[in-house]
């Protein structure tokens, strides 16, 4: 009977958002997305948990809640959360609860302490990445002529989600297809009578190290993260227990050569090195970057003109090209699956386009600078990567709440779109298996980014309370076992969801 009630409560909780037009579903005339798999982020001492294949798409974006309901009071929140805050796992935690519409702080417990954020770092990275790419902007993978008629150059343009065959216009992972690119190139070469070519790869766009020096050596080999590269196949995304390739670019090159061979071309693969006609360090035209204290972006997806990003690395004619899903959709997918490599790939490109370095620490510093440019207080905040795998990262719960409020209150539409990719409690992504027990009241009502490293656990997102009010929460727990920390944080969110708290 308890299981039945849990299922019923999950469905009723999701229906609350659905009726309010705050979640996809039949009541909003939107199809429910397929549930994305759970991704666990392990570290040196945690056992690795095998995972299913990551999602290829994300849930439909959630529009703002309709109607005006009174916000909870700080006194009401204090009273409602008193019992859960007293549990051992949360006594020394950093907790912040805020009203999602006004941004008013309803609870602040050690919110200004610097803590290890784990994967909630991705919230800061999402805010920064959203400033560097135009709404609707895609990434273009190009093949062009080399210096001679029998040379072709595959130009890495930042798309790490290429389908190995045909592209799928409905997917985020696999929108652009390597097979489609091979069709174009083979057709162009046949039209001019070319039957034999040497294939080069131009890797100069946003190139950098594959893994960070502050990561555990087992992170890539165990599938916690993939290698960070500006070309990759959607079929080779890393997942816990199943590692991706050590060199994604090499995998793409080999696959593309095979596709051309299957289309009747004799292909010789060139050794690694500088591609014909490629400059030493191509730099695409950077997006205008607002300065610190300036007004946040206000362009919306519906009014912006989509653009395509591709490095220009030589005078050779283009023989074929394919375009990725919009960057904002890739960013949402990275949040849904807590995809460490994809987050790093997008952040590195964003930093590179802005003129920053491509080393992990340089990208982390760039993320902090962009968050500061949004007018948020980043004093003392340090990031050694963009994904949150580094234990050297330090962030305040109050800053994470600032970023969430900025996304939800309408001041930063691109960030809001990214936040639509946050997992839904009990339903999708890294929250698919949470809020399914005694805390099921938050199932379907909470969206949050998880964070898990040994001795450092976090949960940051939003939840709709019993009065239909959107509230933002951040919880950061240190020195507690992962299971105890997760249970306590889930109980905290459930208490917020159950609260009118006026």
Language-model region placement:
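A small/polar active-site loop signature that marks catalytic segments
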Residues: 227, 234-416
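N-terminal low-complexity, Pro/Thr-rich disordered segments
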Residues: 22-79, 268, 273-314, 432-438
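Short, well-structured active-site flanking segments
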Residues: 132-148, 269-270, 415-418
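Hydrophobic single-pass membrane-targeting/anchoring helices
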Residues: 1-35, 42, 197
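Beta-lactamase-like hydrolase cores
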Residues: 36-113, 135, 182-193
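Small-residue-rich helix-loop
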Residues: 351-502
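Active-site SXXK
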Residues: 103, 117-135, 231, 255-256, ...
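Active-site-adjacent helix/loop patches that line small-molecule binding or acyl-intermediate pockets
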Residues: 141-219, 227-252, 325-366
């Amino acid at each position: 009977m308890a299981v039945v009630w849990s299922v019923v409560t999950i469905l009723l909780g999701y229906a609350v958002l659905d009726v309010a037009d705050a979640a996809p579903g039949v009541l909003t005339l939107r199809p429910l997305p397929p549930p994305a798999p759970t991704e666990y982020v392990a570290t040196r001492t945690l056992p690795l948990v095998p995972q299913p294949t990551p999602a290829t798409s994300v849930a439909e974006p959630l529009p703002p809640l309709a109607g005006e309901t009174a916000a909870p009071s700080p006194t009401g929140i204090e009273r409602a959360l008193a019992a859960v805050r007293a549990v051992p796992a949360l006594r020394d935690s950093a907790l912040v609860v805020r009203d999602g519409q006004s941004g008013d702080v309803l609870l602040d417990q050690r919110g200004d302490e610097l803590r290890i954020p784990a994967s909630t770092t991705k919230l800061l990275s999402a805010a920064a990445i959203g400033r560097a790419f135009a709404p609707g902007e895609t990434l273009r993978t190009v093949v062009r002529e080399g210096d001679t008629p029998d040379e072709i150059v595959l130009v890495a343009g930042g798309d790490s989600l290429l389908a190995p065959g045909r592209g799928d216009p409905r997917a985020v992972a696999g929108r652009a297809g390597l097979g489609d690119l091979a069709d174009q190139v083979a057709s162009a070469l046949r039209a001019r009578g070319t039957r034999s070519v040497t294939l080069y790869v131009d890797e100069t766009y946003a190139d950098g190290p594959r893994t960070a020096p502050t990561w555990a050596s087992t992170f890539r080999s165990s599938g916690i993260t993939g290698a960070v590269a500006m070309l990759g196949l959607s079929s080779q995304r890393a997942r816990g227990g199943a590692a991706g390739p050590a060199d994604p670019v090499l995998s793409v090159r080999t696959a593309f050569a095979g596709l051309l061979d299957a289309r009747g071309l004799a292909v010789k693969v060139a050794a690694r090195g500088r591609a014909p006609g490629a400059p030493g360090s191509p730099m695409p035209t950077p997006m205008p970057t607002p300065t610190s204290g300036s007004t946040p972006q206000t362009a919306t997806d519906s009014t912006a003109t989509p653009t395509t990003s591709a490095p220009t690395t030589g005078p050779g004619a283009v023989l074929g090209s394919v375009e990725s899903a919009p960057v904002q959709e890739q960013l949402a997918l990275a949040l849904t699956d807590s995809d460490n490599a994809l987050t790093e790939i997008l952040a590195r490109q964003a930093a590179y386009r802005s003129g920053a370095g491509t080393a992990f620490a340089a990208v982390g510093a760039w993320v902090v600078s962009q968050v500061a440019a949004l007018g948020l207080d980043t004093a003392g905040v340090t990031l050694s990567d963009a994904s949150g795998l580094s234990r050297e990262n330090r962030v305040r719960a109050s800053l994470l709440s600032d970023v969430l409020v900025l996304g939800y209150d309408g001041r930063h539409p691109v960030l809001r779109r990214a936040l639509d990719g946050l997992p839904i409690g009990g339903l999708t992504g890294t929250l698919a298996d949470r809020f399914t027990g005694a805390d099921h009241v938050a199932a379907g009502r909470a969206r949050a980014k998880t964070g898990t490293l040994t001795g450092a656990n976090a949960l940051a997102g939003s939840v709709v309370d019993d009065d239909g009010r959107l509230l933002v929460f951040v919880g950061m727990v240190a020195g507690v076992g992962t299971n105890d920390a997760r249970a306590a944080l889930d109980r905290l969110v459930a208490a917020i969801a159950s609260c009118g708290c006026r």
